[in-house]
């Protein structure tokens, strides 16, 4: 709970600045890249979140990271602030909250679409179009593959789930036959 409120506070502050400067989308993308980079490197995560490392050591790494990702000054300053306050461990939650605020601001929703096999571009676009009609918003797909579905897709938009998987259809048929 505390982590969520702290992350929300930082994300809202940065988001307000992004709106003011008209940089919501670029900052959202660069923050997501930053998050993926940090999460993808256990060593980097260790250095950034472990208070054993001095402030100067963390700051030097953050400077190199910001330069490598070509972060604009405000997102980079967020990193420095988090480092100075030993809160770099909150980065993932801050980025997720910022991304949610950005999506809401830009009138879009994210849908998690799970399929039995990888979706090609046209199938993914068709699903996104149908979900856009249902939600009256632009839909961005986060795709996953789960062979256990056997066929079809499961789409989740917020708390709403559309389950068109073969696995669920077979389970429904099995239940009906048992009655």
Swiss-Prot record:
GO terms for molecular function: proton-transporting ATP synthase activity, rotational mechanism. Signal peptide: none annotated. F(1)F(0) ATP synthase produces ATP from ADP in the presence of a proton or sodium gradient. F-type ATPases consist of two structural domains, F(1) containing the extramembraneous catalytic core and F(0) containing the membrane proton channel, linked together by a central stalk and a peripheral stalk. During catalysis, ATP synthesis in the catalytic domain of F(1) is coupled via a rotary mechanism of the central stalk subunits to proton translocation. The keyword Isomerase does not apply. F-type ATPases have 2 components, F(1) - the catalytic core - and F(0) - the membrane proton channel. F(1) has five subunits: alpha(3), beta(3), gamma(1), delta(1), epsilon(1). F(0) has three main subunits: a(1), b(2) and c(10-14). The alpha and beta chains form an alternating ring which encloses part of the gamma chain. F(1) is attached to F(0) by a central stalk formed by the gamma and epsilon chains, while a peripheral stalk is formed by the delta and b chains. Belongs to the ATPase delta chain family. It is found in: Cell inner membrane. The gene is atpH. It is a peripheral membrane protein. Keywords: ATP synthesis, Cell inner membrane, Cell membrane, CF(1), Hydrogen ion transport, Ion transport, Membrane, Transport. GO terms for cellular component: plasma membrane; proton-transporting ATP synthase complex. This is ATP synthase subunit delta. The lineage of its organism: Bacteria, Pseudomonadati, Myxococcota, Myxococcia, Myxococcales. It comes from Anaeromyxobacter sp. (strain Fw109-5).
């Amino acid at each position: 709970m505390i982590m969520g409120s702290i992350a929300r506070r930082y994300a809202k502050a940065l988001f307000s600045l992004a709106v003011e400067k008209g940089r919501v989308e670029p900052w959202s993308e660069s923050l997501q890249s930053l998050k993926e980079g940090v999460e993808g490197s256990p060593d980097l995560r260790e250095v950034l979140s472990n208070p054993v490392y001095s402030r100067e050591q963390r700051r030097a790494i953050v400077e190199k990271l910001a330069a490598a990702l070509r972060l604009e000054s405000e997102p980079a300053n967020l990193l420095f602030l988090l480092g100075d306050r030993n809160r770099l461990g909150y980065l993932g939650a801050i980025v997720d909250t910022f991304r949610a605020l950005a999506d809401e601001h830009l009138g879009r929703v994210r849908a998690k679409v799970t399929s039995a096999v990888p979706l090609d571009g046209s199938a993914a676009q068709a699903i996104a179009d149908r979900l856009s009609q249902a939600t009256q918003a632009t839909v961005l797909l986060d795709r996953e593959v789960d062979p256990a579905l056997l066929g079809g897709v499961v789409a989740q938009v917020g708390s709403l789930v559309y389950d068109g998987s073969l696995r669920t259809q077979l389970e429904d048929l099995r239940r009906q036959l048992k009655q």
